[in-house]
Amino acid sequence: MKSVRYLIGLFAFIACYYLLPISTRLLWQPDETRYAEISREMLASGDWIVPHLLGLRYFEKPIAGYWINSIGQWLFGANNFGVRAGVIFATLLTAALVTWFTLRLWRDKRLALLAAVIYLSLFIVYAIGTYAVLDPFIAFWLVAGMCSFWLAMQAQTWKGKSAGFLLLGITCGMGVMTKGFLALAVPVLSVLPWVATQKRWKDLFIYGWLAVISCVLTVLPWGLAIAQREPDFWHYFFWVEHIQRFAMDDAQHRAPFWYYLPVIIAGSLPWLGLLPGALYAGWKNRKHSATVYLLSWTIMPLLFFSVAKGKLPTYILSCFAPLAMLMAHYALLAAKNNPLALRINGWINIAFGVTGIIATFVVSPWGPMNTPVWQTFESYKVFCAWSIFSLWAFFGWYTLTNVEKTWSFAALCPLGLALLVGFSIPDRVMEGKHPQFFVEMTQESLQPSRYILTDSVGVAAGLAWSLQRDDIIMYRQTGELKYGLNYPDAKGRFVSGDEFANWLNQHRQEGIITLVLSVDRNEDINSLAIPPADAIDRQERLVLIQYRPK
């Protein structure tokens, strides 16, 4: 009966966090709008080999993540939930692997369920796991690889070992097809410390080639297909997207070595109080084979991405699966022996909630700021934000009422965030970061436009997805579309600022021409170097400028 209650509670938890509130949040640009539009175009064109964005070749990532996103929109439609369905599914599958692997290591159903709940309620997992990017997919394949390698090394027969290594190769291959060759580097680095400490080199060398073969066979069909269709894909993807992006001096998203320290701290909420103890207990029990394995999968990817010059918070998502397992194991031990860490965790959540309440007041219309985040007419959004932090503090307090029994309710601290964050986004943020909001406000003007030009790739993708058209033209800036725009068949998809006046004269009689420009909040749009327009509609950070036929 208790198991049934636990399962009902888990399904309710998943529904409240990962299903019900997702449609209430508009898509963010540039990431969500980009991946939404790539998948929409894949469905519309039927081309499942070469990824395109705005009708242009887009070689930033391989294909597998787009496949999953496309299936999400195919099943649930071109809406907010459909766009995010793939990442939610991948996150829930990862949690299922966490449950299964924890159960296999410790043979404790309660511990296994707790590990999954901790994983799903971690701030970084929830933030990225409900956000339409490719990182939840690669995290799933890496965690699947973690489980596969353990299965292979624990098997007692050659058939079991062979099956485990073949499965490992498939997960690595799918990882390569999702985000590239990092899906090979991370597993190798993660298993080496365990293999060294356990002296299991023999099994690795005897059976490892099976993983190599299955990985190659997994990637080969699509790899050959895209090489035939687009011979320069692999050169661009390997050299630009891997070497330049991560290792060279001009790497994208450069950050210092310690960049991930605050990410780990913030990402571990609402379980931050367990982080030091879980890592220390793991190190203290390093003679235990499973503990060393989980520690290695937590720390080695973190060190690898810290050394790389290019960094983003999403890169270390896979580290939190083994970390959640270590946290769950440590939490149960602490509840039995010394609940100090659980009390500290409760106080951290109270402090975070109270700090959020105060910060919300400071940036509200009634606070001391001259330019508040929310305007007076957005009072309900301020109250939503207060509710988010109030619930966080409340559940933090509740975990302290009988800490040995109630500590696990920390999983409900982000409940207000899950349910209300979509209703608390300030208009000033929505106007710049949510193209759907802009389209909603300007739908009647945008719909009949013969040509639409914009100076932002993220906005262009949002316009294309919302309006169901892929012919948006880039104006002044090429951004990440620079490579695709260099192809001969992309001629006419970019108009520079100097060319715009002549281009306008040539195309004006074909129909309404609309410019959508990103501007600074205090920028005078009359100072823009453009021909006089027939209509201007400013929505704070985005401006719609129209030219009608003469």
Curated annotation (Swiss-Prot):
The keyword Lipid biosynthesis applies. It is found in: Cell inner membrane. InterPro entries: ArnT_tfrase, Glyco_trans_39/83, LipidA_mod_glycosyltrf_83. The chain crosses the membrane at residues 7-27, 81-101, 113-133, 134-154, 165-185, 204-224, 263-283, 288-308, 315-335, 346-366, 382-402, 406-426. Keywords: Cell inner membrane, Cell membrane, Glycosyltransferase, Lipid A biosynthesis, Lipid biosynthesis, Lipid metabolism, Lipopolysaccharide biosynthesis, Membrane, Transferase, Transmembrane, Transmembrane helix. GO terms for molecular function: 4-amino-4-deoxy-L-arabinose transferase activity; mannosyltransferase activity. Pathway: Lipopolysaccharide metabolism; 4-amino-4-deoxy-beta-L-arabinose-lipid A biosynthesis. Pfam families: PMT (PF02366). One of its GO terms (biological process) is response to iron(III) ion. Catalyzes the transfer of the L-Ara4N moiety of the glycolipid undecaprenyl phosphate-alpha-L-Ara4N to lipid A. The modified arabinose is attached to lipid A and is required for resistance to polymyxin and cationic antimicrobial peptides. Belongs to the glycosyltransferase 83 family. This is Undecaprenyl phosphate-alpha-4-amino-4-deoxy-L-arabinose arabinosyl transferase. It comes from Escherichia coli O17:K52:H18 (strain UMN026 / ExPEC). The lineage of its organism: Bacteria, Pseudomonadati, Pseudomonadota, Gammaproteobacteria, Enterobacterales. The gene is arnT.
